[in-house]
Amino acid sequence: MSKRDFYEVLGVGRDASEREIKKAYKRLAMKFHPDRNPGNKEAEASFKEVKEAYEILTDGDKKAAYDQFGHAGVDPNRGGGGFGGGADFGDVFGDVFGDIFGGGRRGGQRQAARGSDLRYNLELSLEEAVRGLTKELRIPTLAACDACDGSGAKKGSSPTTCGTCHGQGQVQMRQGFFAVQQACPTCHGRGKIIKDPCNKCHGEGRVEKSKTLSVKIPAGVDTGDRIRLSGEGEAGEYGAPPGDLYVQVSVREHAIFQRDGNNLYCEVPISFSKAALGGEIEVPTLDGKVNLKIPAETQTGRMFRMRGKGVKSVRSHAVGDLLCKVVMETPVNLNERQKELLREFEDTLTGQSKKHSPKAEGFFDGVKKFFQDLNS
């Protein structure tokens, strides 16, 4: 009977992280454990299958061989060999089989893995991003077990030397005339075995935990910026260095301002009379309202630049500008008197539209030329 795919056994994808694989294993191991299913042969077989899949997929060397060659890559009996002692053939065949069996090591036990890096997505308002602030972040992570100080062994005990590999972390596997090294299947390449595991972390040396960090967000950050906090990732295996935490910044859209680099943009409505006669209008900035002088005969869509009213660069002392686009609004809900005044004003423009409407002049001249060209 052929073996099932190890990823299928654990119910995880081929891109699953080691943490996801461990979670799946713990859940299935509890489900099929013989103590919970006394006398159930099917559950016992499933438990062994789950255990084998876990041992392969959490060992870097075996996982690499399995991903490349399937079950044949991790079968110790393939080629009539097996595990055993003897001379160290790693120097001779390490370069040949290194890629297959995760080689490159000239003997010696596998180093405990550095902790995984973590990513935290932080959403900020535009005001927070521009001014900077300190944020309290709650981070779910794997922390070193405080009951065993990350060793995985119960207090008062310590890991013992593996009897299979004699502390080397590797064993010989024979392939016909060849012999190659791979991680010891008993200790998973560590060279030591925990016979009396810690009750709190169950020999893992790490426990799931949430921690709170106070993170300073510098002024001027923008969407896509990343803040690295060294050593604040997951704890490493059995005392290995921790990973890092990366805070990924995104900035929410603002109701008034749009940001482009260090510059801010906004649209400011102005009345018809203000655009024609000129005057001062109030313009919003992130520091409060300021007055902007509008010259007479301002056309809708004109852009005004207010220097130094943008965003301070997070990488230098440069400060961007605020660009205000004025948009002339057509008056609504007019009373009869106001309508009458507008009609009188319109009458005064009769025959003088070119003089008072420069854009209209250009438009109608263009229309006239279009029809002339069409009929020529």
Swiss-Prot record:
Q: Where are the CXXCXGXG motif repeats?
A: 145-152, 162-169, 184-191, 198-205
Which residues of the sequence carry a binding annotation for Zn(2+) 2? Answer: C162, C165, C184, C187
| CDD domains reported in the protein's UniProt record | DnaJ, DnaJ_C, DnaJ_zf
Q: Which SUPFAM superfamilies does the annotation name?
A: Chaperone J-domain, DnaJ/Hsp40 cysteine-rich domain, HSP40/DnaJ peptide-binding domain
One GO MF term: heat shock protein binding
Offer a single GO CC term for the protein.
cytoplasm
Q: Where in the cell is it found?
A: Cytoplasm
Kindly report the protein's main subcellular placement as a broad class.
cytoplasm
Q: What does this protein do?
A: Participates actively in the response to hyperosmotic and heat shock by preventing the aggregation of stress-denatured proteins and by disaggregating proteins, also in an autonomous, DnaK-independent fashion. Unfolded proteins bind initially to DnaJ; upon interaction with the DnaJ-bound protein, DnaK hydrolyzes its bound ATP, resulting in the formation of a stable complex. GrpE releases ADP from DnaK; ATP binding to DnaK triggers the release of the substrate protein, thus completing the reaction cycle.
Q: How does it assemble?
A: Homodimer.
Protein name (record): Chaperone protein DnaJ
- Which gene name does the record give? dnaJ
